[in-house]
Amino acid sequence: MNANDNVVIVGTGLAGVEVAFGLRASGWEGNIRLVGDATVIPHHLPPLSKAYLAGKATAESLYLRTPDAYAAQNIQLLGGTQVTAINRDRQQVILSDGRALDYDRLVLATGGRPRPLPVASGAVGKANNFRYLRTLEDAECIRRQLIADNRLVVIGGGYIGLEVAATAIKANMHVTLLDTAARVLERVTAPPVSAFYEHLHREAGVDIRTGTQVCGFEMSTDQQKVTAVLCEDGTRLPADLVIAGIGLIPNCELASAAGLQVDNGIVINEHMQTSDPLIMAVGDCARFHSQLYDRWVRIESVPNALEQARKIAAILCGKVPRDEAAPWFWSDQYEIGLKMVGLSEGYDRIIVRGSLAQPDFSVFYLQGDRVLAVDTVNRPVEFNQSKQIITDRLPVEPNLLGDESVPLKEIIAAAKAELSSA
């Protein structure tokens, strides 16, 4: 099957690697070339802000596959190689070394890059103690600077910022976290969940300052290091290390230059195809119409990358892909496991199951009577049950969700019975 067809995958992150190995597992017999500008063996990214930063994981433990697995599966890994252009007429990608690779199918798994802090240009961006956290090199540089009693300023109150703050506190650093928003995790959680995490971090020793805008930096006399962070309210924060995490920009430039449709991501259809049917896109860079939510989304998560990669492998090998599953995310901070399923945008009320005073609760986001999303804190069973509620769009009784005397599995069973009798 497809013995003479060439697949070129641009991007050696999780999505790209999973497409390559998924194709082989699904029976693809043609050539598979995996091209990326990273010079290291493809690796997992989430542990960079957690176990790896804390010194509890090695670089080797992060490998997506062992180095010899690529050759064993006849997958050609071209690391340290940038794709500079796509020639759609010739069905070729042009590499930075001048070579051209033919393709019958092209998969763009270009991922994203950290959103730059506008005031961190010039010498600031080149300073060794000012970092974003996206690559293994970033994590290694930061890990070397997690020194007890040193001062860390974290800019950004999203998952990355909070995870880095938690790791640094455990390393006995003095940590200040700044966020322009009125609360941490404002974009993704309800106010009570934000309040829980703000309290958690403050109790651990993090100085959280919301509604705070960074306006500049002070540099050492040799312009090699940041020495202080300056805020619009006049605050000056001395710093030995500064880490910024204010979001991700999808890497769409290659697609845009090739004339593909781009709109906050590379636009794809239900078959994972871009505006050119021979070119597909996957992962953080891909924007698609969600059947679950009936709107266009671009999802930055490991589970989404895995699901889309498997879908591409199935489609290219002539198999039926799985239906869309509810997207989910996770974040580990201190000893607390936050797992989230669904997309909460558009919710009009929340229902809390459990007590927000303890690290053991779930928060249901509803639009009318429909559950859009659920945040669970240290409740893995309810997390898995919530995935079923959202993926299957079960008509659960909202008034029972907050009643812990009624097991969630009974609420789900009643909803299934209602569906089957309808």
Curated annotation (Swiss-Prot):
It catalyses: 2 reduced [2Fe-2S]-[putidaredoxin] + NAD(+) + H(+) = 2 oxidized [2Fe-2S]-[putidaredoxin] + NADH. Its EC number is 1.18.1.5. Keywords: FAD, Flavoprotein, NAD, Oxidoreductase. SUPFAM superfamilies: FAD/NAD(P)-binding domain (SSF51905), FAD/NAD-linked reductases, dimerisation (C-terminal) domain (SSF55424). NAD(+) binds at residues 156-165. The keyword Glycoprotein does not apply. The keyword Ribosomal protein does not apply. Disulfide bonds: none annotated. InterPro entries: FAD-oxidoreductase/Apoptosis (IPR050446), FAD/NAD-bd_sf (IPR036188), FAD/NAD-binding_dom (IPR023753), FAD/NAD-linked_Rdtase_dimer_sf (IPR016156), Reductase_C (IPR028202). It comes from the Bacteria. Pathway: Terpene metabolism; (R)-camphor degradation. FAD binds at residues 15, 37, 50, 83, 134, 284, 302. GO terms for molecular function: flavin adenine dinucleotide binding; oxidoreductase activity, acting on NAD(P)H. GO terms for cellular component: cytoplasm. Its cofactor is FAD. Homodimer or monomer. Belongs to the FAD-dependent oxidoreductase family. This is Putidaredoxin reductase CamA. It comes from Pseudomonas putida (Arthrobacter siderocapsulatus). The lineage of its organism: Bacteria, Pseudomonadati, Pseudomonadota, Gammaproteobacteria, Pseudomonadales. The gene is camA.
